[in-house]
């Protein structure tokens, strides 16, 4: 596998996973197929990112992450991408973290309705001070 996995200096339970720039560069093309907005509204886009990441690591990254997180002797993984280049912008990092989250489980899953949902923020436009209004709460759009 093209990953360096080492124990963290603070605890052996924390595993540092270092992802090399060479592997990150392989993700630029598949990540460019999806906009941040498509990640919010299209569940398949999120799964596609996860598949692209796992393919770069020959299907071993998802197994490794799940093994670390489910093992009582470890349980924590810190992923450190080797980013020395400006082509890895904040959108790339959002896509990387979204894909990594989907390798581990099913984020944005509503168990009550058994559906995935996109999350978006609502800008506060009401100037009243009613405690009933919670302007900065997330609204969920079920798909």
Name each model-derived stretch.
Residues 2-143:
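Non-heme Fe(II) oxygenase catalytic core, chiefly the N-lobe of the double-stranded beta-helix
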